[in-house]
Amino acid sequence: MTAPLKAIDGSADLPQLMNDLAKRARAAARVLALAPAEQKNRALEAMERRIRARADVIIAANAEDVAEAKAVGVTPSFVDRLTLTPARVAAMADGIAVVRGVADPVGVVTESWQRPNGMTIERVRVPLGVIGVIFESRPNVAADAGVLCLKSGNAVILRGGSDSFRSCRAIHECLVEGLREAGLPDTAITLVPTRDRAAVGLLLSGLNGGVDVIVPRGGKSLVARVEAEARVPVFAHLEGVNHVYVDGAADLDMAKSIVLNAKMRRTGVCGAAETLLIDRASQDKIKPLVDMLIGAGCEVRGDEAVRAADARVTPANNEDWDTEYLDAIIAAKVVDGVDGAIAHIHAHGSHHTDAIVTQDNKVADKFLNEVDSAIVLHNASTQFADGGEFGFGAEIGIATGKFHARGPVGVEQLTSFKYRIHGTGQTRP
């Protein structure tokens, strides 16, 4: 077991601390890459057990974070993202249990073939190495990222937001003790031990080759900064400007249920719907949909056609179509059928998650095929944009790019591959 790195208040020693942290993580990554699945699963079981046993400690630490955040006047949606309840801590532990049950991807031969000269070539899954995860208000990311990286054989450096520092520290202690119980390096999951914001810039630099990939989890400004400054590859999504399109062939009751859930289940998550598109051929659905949303406490900002259906709708401006509210607000617009919906999403979407509600499978197929988003849904809520709902146990983020990983980034997406070649003495002519 290595000596813990001490937290510091100033930045004078920060570069040295961060480089030491990366070196220890790299050494741990070499051990994890060869660790058997059974040993990793023992660590995960111990982590789950400790999080359940220390739920009160975690919630007490979180209460201090929440009180501090409220004192500086953050938004209700921010408080919701920051808050840990007994149910959310239990869900965190449940997620670890699911990850434990996921097949270990490391060492899996995904393809194998024999060449005419007799050589056998295998494509094999391998860990990425050291992953840096930078996140803001959600303390559960510490657990999700830690266990996913462990299962996939990667070491991880966690840099949580200053708002969730106490919560993350309490969660991290459970993870580290789980590693120790299983005989794995406790530096396999490292929490940056300072709130100093300069740590983010150092992590983005790659720490002299100590970090292989960065995953940001947070708002638009954080992700934009990461993508602009990172000197290593990034798995990132910008905002979730997600749409629900209610087609002319939609069942009204189904549409109401899906729209309400997509917007109001949890308004502060990246899978929340931010724009409602309604087929001009089904304008009779506008009034009941708007009435339902306003009745649930959601502000509706609409175009002229939507405002004509309900005087309580406020005017939408051009910025509304591009806004991730993360709040009880939705923009609403009438479009000319599925083609109009697709055109609007192409112009204003963020390639995250978009849904269609329709009983016409042909129209649904067109939407699913032509909308260029990481997740597209037919007759289901956008709030299913979550690794746990995909059966991944948890997710380290939802990637909206097209390289390496796209959609929920789970265990399998945190691996790369290498080629193993078996010969019998072949030489190249």
From Swiss-Prot:
PROSITE patterns: PROA (PS01223). Pathway: Amino-acid biosynthesis; L-proline biosynthesis; L-glutamate 5-semialdehyde from L-glutamate: step 2/2. The keyword NADP applies. GO terms for cellular component: cytoplasm. One of its GO terms (biological process) is L-proline biosynthetic process. Keywords: Amino-acid biosynthesis, Cytoplasm, NADP, Oxidoreductase, Proline biosynthesis. It is an enzyme of class 1 (oxidoreductase). SUPFAM superfamilies: ALDH-like. It catalyses: L-glutamate 5-semialdehyde + phosphate + NADP(+) = L-glutamyl 5-phosphate + NADPH + H(+). Its EC number is 1.2.1.41. It is found in: Cytoplasm. InterPro entries: Ald_DH/histidinol_DH (IPR016161), Ald_DH_C (IPR016163), Ald_DH_N (IPR016162), Aldehyde_DH_dom (IPR015590), G-glutamylP_reductase_CS (IPR020593), Glu-5-SA_DH (IPR012134), GPR_dom (IPR000965). CDD domains: ALDH_F18-19_ProA-GPR (cd07079). One of its GO terms (molecular function) is NADP binding. HAMAP family: ProA. Belongs to the gamma-glutamyl phosphate reductase family. Catalyzes the NADPH-dependent reduction of L-glutamate 5-phosphate into L-glutamate 5-semialdehyde and phosphate. The product spontaneously undergoes cyclization to form 1-pyrroline-5-carboxylate. This is Gamma-glutamyl phosphate reductase.
